[in-house]
Amino acid sequence: MNSKSGYNRLFDPMAETGQALDFSQHGLGQKTVGNPFSAKAKMSVRNLNVYYDDKQAIHDVSLDINRNEVMAMIGPSGCGKSTFLRCLNRMNDTIENCSVNGEVTLDEQDIYHKKQDVVPLRARVGIVFQKPNPFPKSIYENVAYGPKVHGLVSRRAQLDEIVEDSLRKASLWDEVKDRLFSPGTGLSGGQQQRLCIARTIAVSPEVILMDEPCSALDPIATARIEELMAELSQNFTIAIVTHSMQQAARVSSRTAYFHMGRLIEVNDTRRVFTNPEHELTEAYITGRFG
């Protein structure tokens, strides 16, 4: 299927979008197209279904997320991508009327097993939310909190080292090293989000989930976070939900397109944007609906 240079059109705000189309029921009974599975998977999802009371939000989704990749998840508002992301570290457990069935594994171990403790799971699979949410503590204590709670340190020198290393990895150290005991809430929005990333890194996660991490930030702060994602992917597996197709195109190696709770297509990012296999994907990335 030819998307007429859909990848390039993402960066052209004046591109012709064509006539709006209603694809709301088109092709939804078909299997996911593209390449959702991998021999290099860090996390694997099989036949995942999610319900809020009797409303089904995710329909039979299967997908692998590779080690040390940035996987982007795109789709219209309400398509289920954030619900899917929260299944990867069981954040949906905190929603009273939410039920999940299917299989989600981390290094081939079922994270929904009845004996799985969610506290160490969420240390291994951290999450950065849409809006920066630093604790009402100092910059230092924001980063130190996780290692102390999880018993990762026994000496203050160890904690100091973790705080500095985490802030460096989050590209924040040089900006805050002289005011570590100032309130984290006093930082700019972009700095607060990088502080939240440092806080996540501090407990040595294996996977970092990002749910619209730049939606509340200005373009300069967004660029810093995007650069940071590329650096972090050398040591971490990253899954990001974004409404910005431009961002998905810039930061990710693979992209998954969701529509009405179904995973429509997964493939290398450039291929998704230049030669999508499904009409729904093509219609979305070329602006014909969304």
UniProtKB/Swiss-Prot annotation:
Q: Where in the cell is it found?
A: Cell inner membrane
For this protein, what is the EC number?
A: 7.3.2.1
Q: Which domain of life is it from?
A: Bacteria
Q: Sorted alphabetically, which keywords does the UniProt record give?
A: ATP-binding, Cell inner membrane, Cell membrane, Membrane, Nucleotide-binding, Phosphate transport, Translocase, Transport
One cellular component (GO) term of this entry: plasma membrane
Give the primary localization class. Answer: membrane
Q: Which residues form the ABC transporter domain?
A: 43-285
GO molecular function terms noted in the UniProt entry: ATP binding; ATP hydrolysis activity; ATPase-coupled phosphate ion transmembrane transporter activity
**Gene Ontology biological process terms, A to Z:** phosphate ion transmembrane transport
Entry function: Part of the ABC transporter complex PstSACB involved in phosphate import. Responsible for energy coupling to the transport system.
What is the annotated quaternary arrangement, including any partners?
Answer: The complex is composed of two ATP-binding proteins (PstB), two transmembrane proteins (PstC and PstA) and a solute-binding protein (PstS).
Tell me the protein's name. Phosphate import ATP-binding protein PstB
Query: Lineage from the top down?
Result: Bacteria, Pseudomonadati, Pseudomonadota, Gammaproteobacteria, Alteromonadales
Q: Which gene encodes it?
A: pstB
